[in-house]
């Protein structure tokens, strides 16, 4: 009874078993709503599982590997590029440039695709460049905000310890905010999966799960569409979980001051 009250109490802290039970109940409710949904066009779980089995026999696994590797590559390149640009804002020369780049997140890729096509030397390079651009403009914005939000006291403490300005940058901004890099990465890495369908729809030569999804959607096979979407969701959750595990392993101190861990 105490746990039943606690889940609706503000700032309540539940133990791990209670959290697992709460999640299990909520998942069960979602599944029941799905099974007994009155919407005729909404595929039932059995239909989705059957469609997934058929897609798997047709090579969905290989397409998932292709898309996953492309997304990982795009995230890796985006992370390196965005961090270099964000860290460069410690120098006044680069601040207007990064501010301008961050505003590009408001643009649509429609129209810009033509220019990326002219610059790319292959279909894979075109897909990669589109994904890197889509993720980087958000990533660099988040990291620039993290750097701008570093308290003045941290800089003063480093200077009091007689550190040079480049040492201050290394200790306060690079090492001192490394845990927040994982948070920003976690938030923006999902952008790659959101853009994947469009990117793989533009370049179909290498296949990918986005190509399969577009084909199934074109023929209005809703059960197959749901099966692919749920598979992408599970892959995204695995990616998100992996980034969280990496953060906890490399930055175990990050959660010490948090009330909800």
Functional labels for PLM-detected ranges:
Residues 1-24, 241-261:
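Transmembrane alpha-helical segments of polytopic membrane transport and secretion proteins
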Residues 61, 65, 69-85, 89, ...:
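Hydrophobic alpha-helical transmembrane segments of multipass integral membrane proteins
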